[in-house]
Amino acid sequence: DTIRDGHPDTPIVVISPIICPAAEDHSGPTLPNLDGRFDVVERPDELTVGALSLERIRELLAIVVVQRRAAGDSNLQYLHGHELFGAADVDDLPDGLHPNSAGYQRMGERFVSYAFAPSGPFGRPVA
């Protein structure tokens, strides 16, 4: 709200988390195992009530953006993180959580293609 109050017409893109196979349907925290790969810490059921998996975080972010757009904020966009780095990209998560340089490069290229396309949030319509 603070950003939007000061900049009502500025395009804002809410990007949900990219893929992390260990945390897609399990809540965190994530910690590195002995191999240096990140896994979620299993917790008793009573400690998982209300905890957020990546899938749930994406759902909630999408809902908030839809609500804000319905309330008149047409400059707010939602981008599912899998559009930038999804299931086909997991080989570029050497520790299971963080992309390597090739993964970050691909994410940047995909974001530019999305955001600066003529119909994208930062694009300029072709006259």
Task: Write out the residue ranges for each language-model feature.
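Histidine-centered active-site loop/cap adjacent to the catalytic His
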Residues: 94-127
